[in-house]
């Protein structure tokens, strides 16, 4: 998005980063990057709009994308800020995240060419800094026919009013059951899901529940539940929901 107009029917906006695990592993990720990666593997041609540093990690991101035949024209390079990193820790088997700030993806620039997207996917984490937040608002203001918001509430990098402002105006939202309870103000039980959909004028809501699978709720009152097959061994679940988001997007 630097210096030229970009076009993309399927746009993915947000962070690309490296997850750093306690055992020393470093895994390329970030929910938007993972979603774009999966969509590319399905044969789609998503335009990933993100930003990396002018460093070895940034070069590794570009190399990985080229190896997947992904479009790199929306991947910006920041001359000062580093490529994103997240230190992942586990407590009672549940992951926690220490997200390094600032990072290159906090400074995703709009430039003169804001793409017209048919479907725009974005998360909530990239809302934390003003530059990326303003670029996202320009993308949303450019008239995508469908906006899919993937909520990721990562303390301390979220604000309830700010996240809800982006939920409103979207057609589809994905979040886990804890995040739904946070955004619904504790009113997620019973008819609370229907009220959340109605109050935010959504077409549908995808709610994940870990080992209990996921449920799709629609504005028409439909409910579709998917339960996972029994797992013999789980290494970690970081990024698992991003594959689900990708499959959901393919069906919209």
Explain the meaning of each model-derived region.
Residues 1-9, 190-252:
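Conserved phosphate-binding/catalytic region of the ribokinase-like
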Residues 18, 45-124, 143:
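Conserved N-terminal subdomain of the carbohydrate kinase-like
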Residues 16, 125, 151, 243:
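Active-site metal-binding loops of divalent metal-dependent hydrolases
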Residues 102, 125, 152-154, 178, ...:
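Active-site beta-loop-alpha junctions enriched in small/polar residues
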Residues 9-10, 118-119, 172, 204:
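Structural motif
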Residues 1-71, 233-234:
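Glycine-rich phosphate/adenosyl-contacting loop at the front of the ribokinase-like
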Residues 130-145:
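Glycosyltransferases and closely related glycan-assembly transferases
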Residues 145-146, 156-223:
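Conserved phosphate/ATP/ADP-binding segment of small-molecule kinases
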